[in-house]
């Protein structure tokens, strides 16, 4: 019994793992022996061996068949070079490396690191990034260097779990880390928990890295997770703290939202948009405003059924975490990504964090659930199963302000005027579930008036909790003026006047003076 690792026998837990339940393993696997020469002292070197299998699963090759020697000469100097380049760090008398940061590096850089430790170039160029990192962990472990890993826990029905990474959109892959049932029970772990701890490379007959020591859970001491209140038992309140989207030299879009559809912490906001009305650009503006004004708010952008080029553009345009499932992926993949994101957000809120999820779009997520849910035999108009909208509603309904501390804000886009009866039914189901609506107008976008926001139809429930009495009275006056004019003319004049003022405070003062 290993008392240092929480009173459980890690080795027996690993061996109990039936990996065939998670992956389809091909028959006739060939095993090769990798000879790793690790320098143990200045006088001699010892040759060690371990088995790596040419295993394939539904996600591709995990480990290739290869056989080579790593020379002990120069290994110690190359490790010192990694220390100088800040890849290997030193803390509390011990060398360590945070392995998940290697996944963010280009494969060429990872290959260069592995080659620097003695791997032949002709072999390294044939290996995938996962294989290179696997080998690197093995070499570093042999040289008494701790390997640390951060990932989001996905607990499976059999009681054990795996740590998924954001670089793989929290989906299963060869870089996952096994977490034993004993660890999950000991620390009361749930899907979505962010674990940080020491891992080791697979041993004989194993296929995954394994967590051997948990150092933190959701950036807090592991013991905190044992006594936390579950998300569903927390007390929801109306949003009462405004998320200010205005900053110096900001876009008119966020200034308009700040006045006519204010967003609070815990808001359940719906951006209703026809095609080509600028919803993606608007989401980028909102994301940049949040990251600029609130460094403590955790921002996640979830893109479902999206075009790959738009995913790249979003990653490069905003500072938050972007999780995406492209339109060429299966519907089940869309669902899995979305569920991992919402579970991660819930765990953070349980730790009194303020989280914002920007979802594009709730319509596509509902379509994915409609394809993956077992049929109930009750089909609504448009081909929507009556049970299919339950889970996307639970996703959207998770947004709330928490009395005990923390909040989950969800700003989701809903597609309309697409020509699809299904999209129309989905929008009607979600129309009354939010507490803030921002309506984008296709007629304004066609006339190249951006932001194409229909001020008359947009608004926030309980906006008196987010705006001062003075602001409300002046905004009410503007709404009355806009109510008597054409939509295009009213928005055009409003935008022109706002552009002449530096910020909303100055703009409201000019309006009160009759200008």
UniProtKB/Swiss-Prot annotation:
Entry keyword annotation includes Nucleotide-binding: yes
A Pfam entry, by short name: ATP-synt_ab
A GO biological-process term: DNA-templated transcription termination
Alphabetical list of InterPro entries matching this protein: AAA+_ATPase, ATPase_F1/V1/A1_a/bsu_nucl-bd, CSD, NA-bd_OB-fold, P-loop_NTPase, Rho_factor_ATP-bd, Rho_RNA-bd, Term_rho
Keywords on record: ATP-binding, Helicase, Hydrolase, Nucleotide-binding, RNA-binding, Transcription, Transcription regulation, Transcription termination
Domain Rho RNA-BD intervals: 146-221
Enzyme Commission code: 3.6.4.-
Positions that bind ATP: 264-269, 276-281, 307
Group of enzyme by EC: hydrolase
A GO molecular-function descriptor: ATP hydrolysis activity
Cited PANTHER family: TRANSCRIPTION TERMINATION FACTOR RHO (PTHR46425:SF1)
Family of this protein: Belongs to the Rho family.
Function: Facilitates transcription termination by a mechanism that involves Rho binding to the nascent RNA, activation of Rho's RNA-dependent ATPase activity, and release of the mRNA from the DNA template.
Quaternary structure, from the entry: Homohexamer. The homohexamer assembles into an open ring structure.
The name this protein goes by in its record: Transcription termination factor Rho
Lineage: Bacteria, Pseudomonadati, Spirochaetota, Spirochaetia, Spirochaetales
